[in-house]
Amino acid sequence: MALRAKQFDVARQLAGEALKSNRSDRNAVMILAHALIGLGRTDEAITPLERAAKRNDDPEIETLLGHALCGVGRTPDGIAQLRKTAARRPPYLPAFQELAGQIANCGDIGAAVGIMEQALALAPASVDLQLDLGRMHLRNNKRGEARRVLTAARSAAPGRTDILTELARAALLDGAYAEAADTYRHALGLRPDDLLSRANLAVCLMELGERGSGEAALRAVLRGRPHMLGRVALAMATSSRGRFFFRPSAAAKFLEREPERVATP
């Protein structure tokens, strides 16, 4: 419970007490490691994870160990551990996801795509793998491939807002503004409080020539949420039909002003 609530220090203390009674308590080791990583003390998580990995034939422990090793700058060791875990059969899919992410962070996104494709070949029905592969294609600037994979994921899980927003983003980046707008509307119908999707929908509307509707949508995003000013101003600036302001105060002044109404004769 403490770990889920992100009360990392409480979780660390509870796990430590459990390990005093039973040093081989696998669940306590996992909780302790996650808590230490959450506290920014990843280096302290490595030794208990290494000991647990030697005692247990456990891919979850091995994957977290690989993550921790990469997190403290021991990236070659971490990737080697993750490759070893990914080679297990039956496959442990989170190891592929972690391995692909770490390799992508090293700059070899093409290799990361290959790892995700390998994982998907082992578990073709996994929607989560399809989503991760689509995201990886976007990082590799392969927008068409991303849209193809994410469209398949949407067909398999039409109610997943994370898939819908990623597919919409791929369409937006690919210049398919009408498709992106429709997909963002679908996602917002399922999760109306997604402010980032509302801002991106506004960009789509402006690109489609609906500048007034787009700016109205951005005003709605900003209203009562001053912390969203940077994102809203960026949305206006990145649109080819948007507006650019040199000062945040100028953007705020424009967005806080209601648009003038045209008098009807």
Model-derived features: positions:
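Structural signature of alpha-solenoid helical repeat scaffolds
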Residues: K20, A53-K54, A87, A121, ...
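TPR/TPR-like alpha-solenoid helical repeat scaffolds
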Residues: I103, A202-L208, L229-F246
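TPR/TPR-like (Sel1-like) alpha-helical repeat modules
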Residues: R55, L195, A199-G230, A252-P259
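Short coil turns that delineate tetratricopeptide repeat
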Residues: R23, N56-D57, P90, P124, ...
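Canonical tetratricopeptide repeat
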Residues: I31, L64, E98, D132, ...
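Structural signature of tandem alpha-helical TPR/SEL1-like repeats
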Residues: R4-Q13, L39-R51, V72-K84, N105-Q118, ...
